[in-house]
Amino acid sequence: ALVDTSVRLRRLSDRASAALVKIVQEGGSLRTKNFASGSFEGHERGSGETMNQVTKERGGEGVVAHGCMSGCIMRCSGLYPDKNGKLIGKWPEYETIWSFGPHSGIDDLDVIARYDRICDDVGVDTIDVGVGMGLLMAAGALPYGDADAALKLMHEISEGTPLGRVLGCGAETVGRVYGMRRVPTVKGQSLPAYDPRAVKGVGVTYATTPMGADHTAGYAVTANILSVGGKVDPLKSDGQIALSRTLQIATASVDAAGLCLFGAFAVLDIPDALVAVVDMLNAKYGLTLTTDDVVTLGQSILSTERDFNRRAGITDAADRLPDFFSDEDLPPHNTRFDISLEELKTVFNW
């Protein structure tokens, strides 16, 4: 089923999640220079197609279609070599390419791969640090697109310099230290690579998921951009609440089962796939689950997470995007996030 899904046709095994660079660029939601635009002129130099081609041409320790484990049939990763064929690190994921690439005005895949490796070695998140880097550029701490200055700053994280410590703490801290208004975080977590003004379903997820802004918590890109599991116009508000709600419930269950999220593409695309997943879990654990139980489980998990947040002082008032997403147009579609706070409050109505 995984091999036959529509997402498979986009060649995840050949381009990994970086296959999304061109797709999201075409949709006008590839966030550029701290959300100034949804389009990046140098996007092709950081695309999955380019990453695949460069890896093959350089050879050496580079690998295309590398699985996270021996039994993986998706093999949506790879190993990225330098110009001499020596390993830099794993293939950067789409989110990493975006945060250190378009978001920071950098179009050099080699240096993005080095940023990725530094984050892995230090133990910091590439989205949060990449968004923080873009904020530092917006604040004038270093120029947009200055790959060398950015690389030097990345090394300062492990060196423990004052600015390195600020960046290592992520975007929320960068915004506070520099007194910035346009800080793209929800509940302290950085917004990932899809601009909520042009992919409004994922904007609902960003605003409401208990964990803070996270695309994977309810990946509305499926129906908004990829046309997987149906189609909901990404530029309109209609249908986005229901889409995000359904996907957040499903994702909570998928996570609880320990399954790879890419397996959800098959569940969304193939009517019998969910039944197959439930049968698999029943056979493995001696259970008698039904497909209805999957929904109930997801709802229960989300309710528990929201209750935890409330006890920790994170109330429903935190279920919102930063104001600039509602106040500023996003080129090239010139759209805003226009789903009201009252509508967002209905996401968890069950």
What role is predicted for each listed range?
Residues 1-350:
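Extended C-terminal regions of large enzymes
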